């Protein structure tokens, strides 16, 4: 089981991820991405999928044409863990 981060740790981590929003229940991170078109959005999703598989930590996400919405949470900890912030960092690197 992965350890859930406490509130002070969440605040420290969130400071390093200013484009992400923490849910009001403090159990998930969310971010929306906009792209030029569907192909660009799908390419982004493919790159994120490969990274998520490598990290063995998978996002909840949706895609509508040029928009991708991502939610990160560690289900077995019942909230946010270091895994979520590691994947958020990788996603930020992918999107540039």
Swiss-Prot record:
- Cited InterPro entries: PCD_sf (IPR036428), Pterin_deHydtase (IPR001533)
GO BP annotations of the record are: tetrahydrobiopterin biosynthetic process
Q: Which Gene3D superfamilies match?
A: Transcriptional coactivator/pterin dehydratase (3.30.1360.20)
Q: Where are the transmembrane segments?
A: none
Enumerate the UniProt keywords alphabetically: Lyase
Q: Name one GO molecular function term.
A: 4-alpha-hydroxytetrahydrobiopterin dehydratase activity
* Domain of life of the source: Bacteria
From the UniProt record, list the reaction(s) this protein catalyses: (4aS,6R)-4a-hydroxy-L-erythro-5,6,7,8-tetrahydrobiopterin = (6R)-L-erythro-6,7-dihydrobiopterin + H2O
The EC number(s) given in the record are 4.2.1.96
Q: Its family?
A: Belongs to the pterin-4-alpha-carbinolamine dehydratase family.
Please report the name of this protein according to its UniProt entry: Putative pterin-4-alpha-carbinolamine dehydratase
Organism, as annotated: Rhodospirillum rubrum (strain ATCC 11170 / ATH 1.1.1 / DSM 467 / LMG 4362 / NCIMB 8255 / S1)
